[in-house]
Amino acid sequence: YGYTRDFPVEQYWRDNRLNMIHEGTHGIQGLDLLGRKVLMDDGKTLDLLAQRIGQTVQQARGYAELQAESAAVAQGLQTLLDATRAAWSTRQPDEALANATPYLQAFGHVVVAWLWLDVARVAVAAAAGQEDAFLRGKLQAARYFFDFELPKIAAWLAVVAARNPTCREMQDAWFE
């Protein structure tokens, strides 16, 4: 067989060629997101996403247990929107898109935080003061994301907002 692992999941991953194609397109997807998708219809699609996230934040603010998480999503969204505007403030695509990959990573984290906030809101409402292990697990998983993953967006969006030139200025000749 040529594959000596005890568990087949690694072989399934390796044999599915599409996974490797997706891994190789991370940068392209970031360029597409920051360079095309958030600009579509004069930013209306991004505005719609922001409105929907804002609605969930408002609903979650109705629960005392979710105040910190609601504030974190609201702040994350605002940081993302500010970085988007800052990236395009000079209207120079080479400056705006130089850090498209960290933008993609941060954008994804904000969306996942939004989804976790909604899961947490539903869990708190369903528990209604009762102790339920399944719902407690949902809340704890959400809190993990808010405590360990969402804070990463600050660093990613800082280079986007500053239009940091480090990657853009790299030259192939420096590796010859």
Locate the predicted segments by residue.
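C-terminal amphipathic alpha-helical interaction region
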Residues: 37-40, 52-176
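Alpha-helix capping/hinge segments and adjacent helical runs
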Residues: 1-48, 144-167, 171
